[in-house]
């Protein structure tokens, strides 16, 4: 194993931070270590950690579980700060609201994008200040606006006249961000479509309405779509936002000081390309805005690769060369991302019960396999024609990159309780 791997369930994850990141003040270092910074788990270390959870029977009744790699979260924040050093992330809570994950992000300086009263309450319950929240839902129930005013969440988005009237009535001190619709989000994994964002011809009337209501429009927001593969979409959106700033100035409104560039980021090469496009567009269109605060609403960038899911094989059927397996999580649970987030999942065998001397079945013959979820719906099929070695009931299948829009959107259909899936925390120190 490369480095030490430990279970830290029950520990404040901020306690492992060894440096100040993104302007946050870290909590004290982990006991017996005051100098080393945590790093992502190696593949072998992650496997060893999962095997220890399984063999030590830390999971009751062989239930599915997640591992959250806190070192990966630290690494992702380092990548963000290197690529977009002047842009403060407001993590999109809807993507994955795991409390230890949110606490870790908070300790590293991230703020939070909440879309409902429940999400605001959840973030506040972690001891996070309301001034670190943007209520980034352009269409809110009046009761949620009243609650935001009560607890001091004073920044929100809007894209309609009716929203202006609701905010004027219930939270007139709230600062507003006009949500505009980017013209090019066709390459997003999950495009926003027509649901959100003011069209170009709607911008001036909406600014006039907010001005007449004596509300402060502090800036502009947009979202190019979740998981967008085309970094050029940011170029057009940032140019359009600059046009809104200029329109507000022409109307004699208070100077806009906030630009929210939304989400859509994924880690790795795509982030390198996207961040370069964002920096270029900001330099081109906002180089003269000295008082500008730039924020973003990343979700999957931080969540996707930090979580790994372990599932148990609960059933098996052989039909000639075809192997069919049933596991105890599926499309109505964590793998709902296959349907709603257009995700592609991959599985690695962990033969804890049938082949402990060769856990990954390296060198073993593989078979075309189907993997079903546990519910009685035939739609609940996780993988088809997927090459897997011969596995047995009570072996495990491991799914990496399962942090974005997984457990958060799962259901309890057929009595399989997605919300009950436990998350184990781990981190490693460099060797």
From Swiss-Prot:
Residues at the site labelled Stacks against the aromatic ring of pyridoxal phosphate and stabilizes reaction intermediates: 223
Gene Ontology terms for molecular function: ornithine decarboxylase activity
Assigned EC number: 4.1.1.17
Pfam families associated with the record: Orn_Arg_deC_N, Orn_DAP_Arg_deC
Positions annotated to bind pyridoxal 5'-phosphate: 226, 264, 297-300, 405
Record's keyword annotation contains Lyase: yes
Notes on activation and inhibition: Inhibited by antizyme (AZ) in response to polyamine levels. AZ inhibits the assembly of the functional homodimer by binding to ODC monomers and targeting them for ubiquitin-independent proteolytic destruction by the 26S proteasome.
An annotated GO BP: putrescine biosynthetic process from arginine, via ornithine
GO CC list: cytoplasm
Listed cofactors: pyridoxal 5'-phosphate
UniProt family annotation: Belongs to the Orn/Lys/Arg decarboxylase class-II family.
Chain's role: Catalyzes the first and rate-limiting step of polyamine biosynthesis that converts ornithine into putrescine, which is the precursor for the polyamines, spermidine and spermine. Polyamines are essential for cell proliferation and are implicated in cellular processes, ranging from DNA replication to apoptosis.
Record-given protein name: Ornithine decarboxylase
